[in-house]
Curated annotation (Swiss-Prot):
Its main location: cytoplasm. It catalyses: a fatty acyl-[ACP] + phosphate = an acyl phosphate + holo-[ACP]. GO terms for cellular component: cytoplasm. Keywords: Cytoplasm, Lipid biosynthesis, Lipid metabolism, Phospholipid biosynthesis, Phospholipid metabolism, Transferase. This is Phosphate acyltransferase. GO terms for biological process: fatty acid biosynthetic process; phospholipid biosynthetic process. Its EC number is 2.3.1.274. Belongs to the PlsX family. Pathway: Lipid metabolism; phospholipid metabolism. The gene is plsX. InterPro entries: FA_synthesis, Phospholipid_synth_PlsX-like. It comes from Syntrophomonas wolfei subsp. wolfei (strain DSM 2245B / Goettingen). GO terms for molecular function: phosphate:acyl-[acyl carrier protein] acyltransferase activity.
Length: 320
């Protein structure tokens, strides 16, 4: 598998990005990494490692898109930015996937303008796997790509989420729920109430109704749909709470419970953007080498399970 890595994105780029990439590519001979970024800087970092230059290749990209820039404007203006060059490699079939720890907005803009959206998808969402009490995972979608959503877009998220649950986790007839401030159909704002009606009418979705925030860890739902603003705040709150509890346990001299280890974003690695014509994995901005390695692992799993083709097939059934 060939992965284009945005080596300039993230709080610890390029040092930790390079370290994670070197570890991943060394494990299997069929793996290949393209480190996309400022060539001289990346070659300097690579001097610390022994690697096969035919499988770990530096691709020069002279520009970087910062967190402060307008994503859509920067994507158009900075044609040689690392995220743009890496995305073009996927578009041109020179790489099978891209991962980035940089600006999520820039990565989404590159996905839309370079890779393109699947037919019937207006906004690509990010899906996150949340461990639940049953030992399985509950998917939360969207967790940050779209802060404002219309009901029909949330319906599209539900379709993509249930497809992902089936393909990646082998769930038959995934139970899809809508995140709300109460379980009753009448709860919520105009958007959630209209979304509820759309989900209930969609025969291709096993819609089980509204769920509250406390239900996320119970395992009563396989997919939980929400807008990206709510999902991102919720995800970051879970990360912070897990860290708070873990530090308390470790401070008291106790062992770290396995459940809290599963909440650690470094173990999850990354989350895919769904609904685009190419595999794009969004990684945490604070990712270090272990998280980068696991992000590459997620990309490989999605690629091996043909996640792009399976999404397109499922969407064609719905539209048909």
């Amino acid at each position: 598998m060939r992965i284009a890595v945005d080596a300039m994105g993230g709080d610890y780029a390029p040092l930790e990005i390079v370290a994670g990439a070197v570890k991943w590519v060394a494990e299997e001979e069929e793996r290949q990494i393209f480190l996309v970024g400022q060539e001289e800087l990346l070659k300097q970092e690579l001097k610390s490692y022994s690697y096969d230059p035919s499988r770990l290749i530096v691709v020069n990209a002279s520009e970087v898109i910062t967190m402060e820039e307008s994503p859509a404007t920067a994507i158009r203006r900075k044609k040689d930015a690392s995220i743009v060059v890496a995305s073009r490699m996927v578009k041109e079939k020179k790489a099978d996937a891209i991962i980035s720890c940089g600006s999520t907005g820039a990565q989404m803009a590159a996905a839309i303008f370079i890779l393109g959206r699947m037919e019937g998808i207006e906004r690509p969402p990010i899906v996150a796997s949340i461990p639940n009490m049953t030992g399985a995972y509950t998917l939360l979608i969207d967790v940050g790509a779209n802060v404002d959503c219309k009901p029909r877009q949330l319906l599209q998220f539900a379709l993509l989420g249930k497809t992902y649950a089936s393909i990646i986790y082998g769930v038959e007839q995934p139970r899809v729920a809508l995140l709300n401030n109460g379980e009753e159909e009448s709860k919520g704002n105009t958007v959630t109430m209209e979304t509820y009606a759309l989900l209930r009418q969609q025969s291709g979705i096993n819609f089980t109704g509204n769920v509250e925030g406390r239900d996320i860890f119970t395992g009563k739902s396989d997919v939980i749909v929400c807008d990206g603003f709510t999902g991102n705040v919720l995800l970051k709150t879970m990360e912070g709470m897990a860290l708070f509890i873990a530090q308390g346990i470790l401070g008291a001299g106790g062992p770290m419970p396995a459940f809290f280890q599963r909440l650690d974003y470094t173990q999850t690695g990354g989350a895919p953007l769904l609904g685009i014509n190419g595999l794009s994995i969004v990684c945490h901005g604070s990712s270090k080498r272990e998280a980068v390695y696991n992000g590459l692992r997620i990309a490989e799993d999605c690629y091996n399970k043909n996640i792009i083709e399976m999404q397109q097939l499922e969407l064609s059934k719905i539209s048909g």
